[in-house]
């Protein structure tokens, strides 16, 4: 399975490298949001920190991932509609390799996007006191979040009837950081909005990453964040597998 998955992964990565504008496009939106919030709104937002880009970066990284996984749906949808998926199914390869290749491609592509966003944040003044273990923990959380959303993206990629349908699911995911602690403290929100913000996955993930990067108190946020990621991944994997079995006929 590993060798077959590697071959399929190589095919998808070559497609991405032939059109690097995909990664650039995915990175541009969160970078533009970061520029807008830091240089236009940053002075008016009270977060209790002097460096707003430090406060903002964790949420921007999650937004970049949410934007990036949408391309998983697109790539899978194109494989299905072009008949390439049907050809793969007839080949002597383990069928799960087909989906895992798309999942790993999403993981690699999002790593590249995250690196680009962090480099831009460094130019804007981002600084962290995190040690190597903290950074590894941050990488682990971001990786789990990417895998969770990628398996979620597999479902519309297999079931959508149009390109628009394959990408539309990502819109709520990109919007979630706006109703979380990503941009402003939840304490400043109206009660109903605050109740939602404090009990959705992005807030706990953002808080955990922020604490790891800036020597804060991680507390239960990291376990809640991991529970959200694992829960979304398991549920998405289950429904993606069912959708794939229907695709196999």
Predicted features and spans:
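Short, membrane-interfacial amphipathic segments enriched in basic
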Residues: 1-9, 149, 192-203
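Aromatic- and glycine-rich beta-strand/loop motifs that create alpha-glucan
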Residues: 1-29
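Membrane-interfacial helix-loop-helix junctions in multi-pass membrane proteins
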Residues: 15, 46-47, 180-234
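Residue-level recognition of transmembrane alpha-helices
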Residues: 26-27, 56, 60, 79, ...
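Hydrophobic alpha-helical transmembrane segments of multi-pass membrane transport proteins
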Residues: 32-37, 53-124, 156, 169-172, ...
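Transmembrane helix segments
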Residues: 36-44, 157-199
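Alpha-helical transmembrane segments and their short interhelical loops
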Residues: 95-168, 217-241
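Short cytosolic juxtamembrane segments of multi-pass membrane proteins
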Residues: 242-249
């Amino acid at each position: 399975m590993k060798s077959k998955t590697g071959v399929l992964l190589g095919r998808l990565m070559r497609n991405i490298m032939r059109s690097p504008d995909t990664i650039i496009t995915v990175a541009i939106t969160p970078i533009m949001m970061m520029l807008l919030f830091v240089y236009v709104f940053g002075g008016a937002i009270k977060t209790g920190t002097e460096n707003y880009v430090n406060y903002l970066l964790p949420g921007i990284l999650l937004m970049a991932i949410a934007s990036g996984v949408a391309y998983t749906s697109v790539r899978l949808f194109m494989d299905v509609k072009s008949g390439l998926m049907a050809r793969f199914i007839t080949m002597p390869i383990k069928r799960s390799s087909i989906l895992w290749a798309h999942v790993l491609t999403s993981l690699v592509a999002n790593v590249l996007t995250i690196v680009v966003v962090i480099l831009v944040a460094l130019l804007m003044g981002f600084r962290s006191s995190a040690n190597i273990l903290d950074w590894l923990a941050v990488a682990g959380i971001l990786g789990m979040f990417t895998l969770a959303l990628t398996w979620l993206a597999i479902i519309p990629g297999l079931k959508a009837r149009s390109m628009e349908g394959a990408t539309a699911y990502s819109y709520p995911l990109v919007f979630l950081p706006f109703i979380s602690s990503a941009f402003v403290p939840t304490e400043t929100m109206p009660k109903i909005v605050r109740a939602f913000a404090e009990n959705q996955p992005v807030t706990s993930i953002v808080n955990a990453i922020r604490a790891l990067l800036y020597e804060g108190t991680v507390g239960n946020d990291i376990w809640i964040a991991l529970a959200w990621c694992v829960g979304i991944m398991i549920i998405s994997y289950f429904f993606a597998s069912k959708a794939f079995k229907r695709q196999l006929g």
